[in-house]
A protein has these predicted regions:
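Small-residue-enriched hydrophobic alpha-helices in membranes
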Residues: 1-37, 41, 46-161
Length: 161
């Protein structure tokens, strides 16, 4: 490396030096990016949401917590540069059967409720996503209610700990 190359490298931002290629948008990455996008929709990325995303990815991919965290990190990068939410949902709709898409909707609601609050912008993103996933409205309502009930149970057990 020449002196000029070394000097040029010093003036590059850390982001410019560490750019890695984005992962392919396959089903696991599309799911993870959707989870991250829903969590970020209220402009707050709570640690509870991050933990819930890791648990969902671990469950859906049958991987351990460290691999789930690595997958989430890839999905965070993908989400930042990826197309709009309906494109992720469309990929999942094409690739995943109805029962699994319904499971995805429930997982998305679990992330929404992980921080203990439902904000209007999150509800709006969920409405669009559920529609793009092709989930019936009564199934969406049931998935939301299940996630909300589970969040209440989780919050109550955390308070008593």
């Amino acid at each position: 490396m020449s002196v000029l190359d070394r000097l040029t490298a010093l003036f590059k931002t850390p982001v410019q030096r560490e750019i890695k290629p984005l992962p392919a948008t396959d089903v696991p990455h599309a799911l993870g990016a959707l989870l991250v996008r829903v969590a970020l929709s209220d402009k707050q990325y709570a640690v509870q949401e991050i933990g819930q995303i890791d648990r969902v990815l671990a469950k859906f991919q049958n991987i351990g917590p460290i691999d789930a965290a690595k997958l989430r990190a890839e999905c965070e990068r993908l989400e930042a540069f990826a197309p709009n939410t309906p494109d992720f949902a469309h990929l999942l709709r094409k690739s995943v059967d109805y029962a699994d898409r319904l499971g995805i909707v429930k997982a998305l609601w679990q992330v929404v409720y992980a921080d203990g609050a439902l904000r209007e912008v999150e509800a709006d993103v969920m409405e669009i996503t559920q529609s793009q996933l092709g989930i019936k409205s009564q199934d969406c309502a049931a998935a939301q209610a299940d996630a909300q009930n589970q969040a209440a149970i989780d919050n109550a057990s955390n308070l008593s700990s």
